[in-house]
Amino acid sequence: MAEPQRARPKPTPETQHFWDGTQAGELRLQRCDACAHVYFPPRPFCPSCASRKVSIFKASGKGFLYSYVINHRPAAPGFTPPYAIAVVELAEGPRMMSNIIDCPQTPEALELDMKLEVAFEKLDDKITLPVFRPAKG
């Protein structure tokens, strides 16, 4: 029997630039041209000042582990427990939920404030997800 597939995000016109970026191996964020606020998730206006004058830019892909929970139950198709659901604070300021790869999914390995870098997990020809791994060096 085939293993269940992980849920796929559905790009919208407002988020398409983000998904195009992940397919290109880039983590793209938005910056308000009026107040300089950097934000995620993508939206057509600044959540800080409501300006619609926003720019898209390639983020550094660096951040740190802000928070996480380790799921030990097979609650979601496509995941093998245990797996961490993490909140990563990006160097540019926004926080995003993601998964941590390339390290044990244990409290001993997942230290708060540990430095992380983005990696990309290709699900299919249309969707590539940003995931994070411990930073090298």
Give the residues covered by each predicted segment.
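A broadly conserved sequence feature marking short terminus-proximal activation segments
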Residues: 1-27, 135-137
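Short, cysteine/histidine-rich loop/knuckle motifs that typically chelate Zn2+
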Residues: 31-34, 45-51
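Short functional micro-motifs and their immediate structural scaffolds
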Residues: 40, 53-55
